[in-house]
Each structure stands twice: as C-alpha cells, then as structure tokens.
Regions:
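Activation on beta-sandwich/Ig-like modules and their edge loops
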Residues: 27-153, 160-161, 167
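Bacterial N-terminal signal peptides
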Residues: 11-20
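A short, hydrophobic C-terminal helix/tail in secreted or cell-surface proteins
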Residues: 191-209
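Sec/Tat signal peptide C-region and signal peptidase I cleavage site
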Residues: 21-26
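C-terminal outer-membrane/trafficking sorting elements
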Residues: 211-213
Length: 213
C-alpha cells in the first residue's frame, strides 16, 4: 500500500512540475519577430515580448547575433515596465519614426535576415533566444534547440503559445503570414500542449491501475 501511494505521489509531483515549468513565466519571452518586409525594412521591423503586466524591464538587453560570425551587431537596453496587457512591442526607427502598430518603444533594430539570432538577456544571463533561418555547419546558432523557420518576405515568426516554452525554437515558433504586433493568442483559447496532455493521461492511467489492484 505504501509503495502504491509513493508511486502515486511521485507521478503527480512530476506531472505538476512539468506543467509548472512549461507555463510559469519567470521572465519575459520573445513572442514574435518580424525582420524581412516586402521591400524596404525601414520602420517596419519589430520585436514583440510577452510577460507579466507591471514586470520591470530594467536591466534587460535585446541583442541581434550575426549567424556568420557570432558577433553582436545590435544591442538595445530596455527600461520601464511591461504594459498592462503583458505585451511589449519594439518598433524599428526609420529615422523619422516607425510604421509598426502598437509600438511601445521605437529604436534602431533593423534585424538581419537569417540565419541569425535574437537574444533577450537579463542580469542573470540569457532569458530567451530565437534563431531563425537555415544554419550551415560553420554558422553560429544562438537560439534554443533547433532554428525557427525562415519565412518569406512580409511574414513573421511567432510563438505558438506565449505561455509555453519548450526550449526549442523549431517547436515553439511558426510562420505568420500577416504579422500581428501587440497581439498574442488568448491564453484561454490555447489548448494544452500534446506532450503535457499525453503525460497527464499516462499518469492518470497509472493511478487508475494502482487503485484497481
């Protein structure tokens, strides 16, 4: 009886830990990136972050990493707090402002086409990163896991679920034909990730079998 209870406790603890680790956001994440407009990029490129409303952005730095050399070619220090909707948009400055809707900050962030990476750093180190494009054997990948897709001009890459981070860009990001700066999927409308659902189903089956013995 003690063994069955212990296994039940461990199984539920693992399931809870997986869900907590998947959904709890201790820091902002990169939720959308648009780097290649149809025609000139000036004033159209943007980076979108998602985090907890009111969370401080002081000390955060966004870097553009060259995929060919690994050098930091763009660095932007952030400040202030995350807006009430939890979405912070950085719009590229064309020299005369920006054309990015819902921009919370306007700065020179004309990110290069891939293969490259964008890294979000905090005082403790890297908080999030996305590498995009097709990386060759000699290229430098500064993202997480595998590279996110490299969309055609006019499209962006966006996190499928702003509350879920597997640590693999190829899984977490997809192409958006129409960029949506300032808008992320509603948390209530996003289904539980398949991996978490399968794990939960398996654990509940295990518990059921233990109870029937």
């Amino acid at each position: 009886m003690k063994t069955a209870c212990l296994k039940y406790f461990v199984s539920c603890s693992i399931f809870s830990a997986v869900l907590a680790g998947s959904y709890a956001q201790a820091a902002p994440v990169i939720s959308e990136l648009f780097y290649d407009a149809s025609g000139s990029d000036a004033g159209l490129v943007f980076l979108e972050l998602f985090g907890s409303p009111g969370e401080s952005l002081d000390g955060l730095v966004v870097e553009g990493i060259n995929g060919g050399t690994g050098d930091v070619y763009s660095s932007l220090a952030l400040s202030g707090v995350m807006p009430g909707d939890g979405v912070f948009v950085i719009g590229d400055d064309s020299g005369g402002g920006t054309s990015v809707a819902n921009a919370d900050l306007v700065a020179d962030i004309d990110y290069q086409n891939g293969p490259d990476s964008v890294v979000l750093r905090g005082l403790s180190g890297v908080l999030d990163a996305v590498g995009y494009g097709v990386f060759g054997v000699n290229d430098i990948f500064a993202g997480e896991g595998g590279a996110a897709p490299d969309p055609s001009a006019g499209s962006s890459i966006a996190r499928l679920n702003a509350l879920f981070d597997t640590g693999d860009n190829s899984v977490d990001f997809s192409v958006l034909d129409t960029p949506t700066p300032g808008s992320v999927p509603s948390v209530s409308a996003v289904p539980l990730p398949a991996s978490a659902w399968l794990l939960g189903s398996g654990l509940m089956t295990l518990v059921s079998l233990r109870r029937n013995r």
